[in-house]
Amino acid sequence: MIRIDLKQDEMPDHWYNILPDLPEELPTPRDETGEAFDTLKKAVPAKVLEYEFSGERYPKIPDEILERYMQVGRPTPIIRAKKLEELLGGNLKIFLKMESYTYSGSHKINSALAHVFFAREEGAKFVSTETGAGQWGSAVALASALFHMESHIFMVRTSFYAKPYRKYMMYMYGAHPHPSPSEFTEYGREVLKRMPDTPGSLGLAISEAIHYALDNGGKYIAGSVINSDILFKTIAGMEAKKQMEMAGEDPDYIVGVVGGGSNYAALAFPFLADELSSGKIRRTYIASGSKEVPKMTEGEYRYDYPDTGKVLPLLKMYTIGYDFIPPAVYAGGLRYHAVAPTLSLLMNKGIVSARDYDQEEAFKWARIFSETEGYIPAPETSHALPILKEIADKNRGEKKTVLVSFSGHGLLDLGNYAEALHFE
């Protein structure tokens, strides 16, 4: 079998919340200013905050969100990468959860629909958010169009100019993208005055988006890191679990990339549910990231700000520092300085391990994958591919099954690939 599909009437109708199953209680956020929690309550939709701290293990997905999931391409298929299996020696079964098949081209639409829906239900004038490479921004733009909401997207400055096609996508959906830091907010103007040549960062863009929402009657929505965002995205993992069971397959390894953590967590957490409940971890969980932003392999597990402007409460997570300005690598979605608290806790407990790969290694595998499987991965997604070679080499003489979160396609990133790989 090459492709495993779910029919729309077989799609899961619940998200998964990992909080009740964590091996220990998640460290509580800290507010050192006395203002961060109030800011959070004003900026974020109340229903999103309710999910953020909920103890309900399997909350039901609202019907209107389920309908929109189906409208934008859910359920997504699982594809078996048989040619890549042959290239790696034939001892692996490699299954790809194809989140690139959604209308926005990535996994980001899974939570964007929920965030925008809850903002609309609360009567917000608009939504504002940050985006790195533009996958989240284009997903929010699409979700806002479907729910008839205005959206303002603060896109990391280097990506705003280096990745114009996702910006154009946002315009097509009726959104308002802005380079961050921008002249559009007081905070952005202050940053530009201090650092006129800054490439920007996701931390900066988060602060701008929050300030804009607070100052203009909108609601801020986060594209990763927070528990509620991961919960909304677990529709992917819930589908994948059902698909693998239908096919009679049980993954030994679950692999995916981490920018802030929601992509990998959304696939891995539903599989971890039974293992955490039983206290016995039987699969191997590996998350990969960018060596240029080595938060997982060189970061510290400590309290840090999720945004550069120190607007939000401190979270305990793996971090290389809220004020870290990452280099202008093409995998813009991996440039965030920290890892989601839930995923960080699992990493700290040794349940999830981490790898970081530099752009050259990741893009080498992006090209190999494109030539063997005929599908071009997003630059971010390509950072998961070197893990497959490691797994194949480690298990010579043994058959292993690997499930990969194929988080997005690279069709809008061909200009970046052309520069990095020196195409004519």
From Swiss-Prot:
Pathway: Amino-acid biosynthesis; L-tryptophan biosynthesis; L-tryptophan from chorismate: step 5/5. Its EC number is 4.2.1.20. Gene3D superfamilies: 3.40.50.1100. InterPro entries: Trp_synth_b-like, Trp_synth_b_CS, Trp_synth_beta/beta-like, TrpB-like_PALP, TrpB-like_PALP_sf. Tetramer of two alpha and two beta chains. SUPFAM superfamilies: Tryptophan synthase beta subunit-like PLP-dependent enzymes (SSF53686). It catalyses: (1S,2R)-1-C-(indol-3-yl)glycerol 3-phosphate + L-serine = D-glyceraldehyde 3-phosphate + L-tryptophan + H2O. The keyword Ribosomal protein does not apply. Keywords: Amino-acid biosynthesis, Aromatic amino acid biosynthesis, Lyase, Pyridoxal phosphate, Tryptophan biosynthesis. The modification N6-(pyridoxal phosphate)lysine is found at K108. The beta subunit is responsible for the synthesis of L-tryptophan from indole and L-serine. The keyword Amino-acid biosynthesis applies. It comes from the Archaea. Signal peptide: none annotated. This is Tryptophan synthase beta chain. Belongs to the TrpB family. It is an enzyme of class 4 (lyase). GO terms for molecular function: L-serine hydro-lyase (adding indole, L-tryptophan-forming) activity; pyridoxal phosphate binding; tryptophan synthase activity. GO terms for cellular component: cytoplasm. It comes from Thermoplasma acidophilum (strain ATCC 25905 / DSM 1728 / JCM 9062 / NBRC 15155 / AMRC-C165).
